[in-house]
Amino acid sequence: MFKIRSIAVRLILAISLTVAVACAILGTFSIAQQRSLTQLALDQQLKLQYDSVIAAIDYEGRAALAVSSVVAALPPVADAVARDDRDGLAALLDGAMKALTAQGIPLITFQKPPAVVVYRVHAPKVFGEDISSRRSTVVEAIKTGKQIVGVEPGREALSIFGMTPITRDGKIVANADVGAAFGKEFVDRAKKRFGIDLAVHSYDGKAFKKLSS
């Protein structure tokens, strides 16, 4: 059996083995550290993207809520809604509807308790249905008298809504419901404003459907 008798050779081998083990440990640690840093960077980027999307939704919701606040505070609007005067509402709001649509806010609807549509400025011939089954925020706004912002299914598509109850003599008589489409226009504005890549999907209980990207 071969034996190493030289102390110098033994020392060199021992040092070499120690260095090799140390390099292996450091290499393993370096790879793990690199993976950890990469994952951290990805997590931070995902959070940044998520925060940007939430900020975009919040921005659109605040804009819709601001419009609903103004509309609900107009005495002629409150009077027309109370009388179910759709022609009067059209005369008051048709011009504003065109301007708002150009700004990405294409939906204005008025509902009476519990959530019966009185008039849609954007679709004046469609009214009278109870939307409480799909618009819980409308029911809540009329019930509590509080302003609400939320994302819910509209008549044709998912939208971001801001709503303000309309009161007369201290009683809630209706709800001013203003919506920003949660579709291509929203995606385009979010991409431009925050510099993010974004797609919107909806879930119908069985599968996801892409709405816009």
Predicted segments with their positions:
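Generic structural signal of hydrophobic/aromatic residues within well-ordered alpha-helices
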Residues: 38, 77, 93, 138, ...
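Extracytoplasmic/periplasmic ligand-binding sensor regions of membrane-associated signaling proteins
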Residues: 90, 98-179, 185-188, 197
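Short, active-site-adjacent cap segments at secondary-structure transitions
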Residues: 116-118, 206-209
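Extracytoplasmic/periplasmic ligand-binding sensor domains
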Residues: 174, 207-213
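Short, Lys/Arg-rich, polar N-terminal cytosolic tail immediately upstream
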Residues: 1-5
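Glycine-rich beta-alpha junction loops
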Residues: 182, 204-206
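Alpha-helix N-cap/helix-start and coil->helix boundary motif
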Residues: 18, 183-184
